[in-house]
């Protein structure tokens, strides 16, 4: 894999960033890479005997090989299912880059590739003073965009790609994730996206209820 780490963002919240990220981990592992996931900030956690745990972060941990310690994979586990800025304020936490940078450095020593999953859509802030672009710059990562294929996705994808470029960051690929089984003319919409998005197409995750990430990884077309 040309890039030893990248940041996965989406066109919106709820469009399948975690499925995209875990499928990427399985695809990388199928190529023989040691690949681990990371969820720097997760809001909406359940209290367990081991501490606060987030469902998406646990999915990334399960898809990783080797499996990192949870606290390293998810430095900020915030209980409330709110925007990170609000969820952090509820528990008196101030989100900072340094703990994330340190955790990322640990993960880089454990694997050949680190897949870092963001929050919400690209413009969703991390805090009152931090945007996701600040984190991506600090970690020196390229970006992979997951497009939730539903009505309006062409507009959302183009706006997100433009925002990433405006932040001075590189988007190295995009993934089509089918999230609306009722959507008509999916093939044509994906074709229009391929014509209009400048970055390479990394494949498609079909609508397949109940399918696990390892199965969905078969639809990805990662660069060598």
From Swiss-Prot:
GO molecular-function term, one example from the UniProt record: ATP binding
Residues noted as binding Mg(2+) in the record, renumbered to the chain: 18, 56, 117
Keywords attached to this entry: ATP-binding, Biotin biosynthesis, Cytoplasm, Ligase, Magnesium, Metal-binding, Nucleotide-binding
Sequence positions that bind ATP: 56, 117-120, 177-178
Tagged with keyword S-adenosyl-L-methionine: no
InterPro entries, A to Z: DTB_synth_BioD (IPR004472), P-loop_NTPase (IPR027417)
Record field: catalytic activity: (7R,8S)-7,8-diammoniononanoate + CO2 + ATP = (4R,5S)-dethiobiotin + ADP + phosphate + 3 H(+)
GO CC annotations on file: cytosol
Quaternary structure, from the entry: Homodimer.
Alphabetical list of HAMAP family matching this protein: BioD
Protein name: ATP-dependent dethiobiotin synthetase BioD
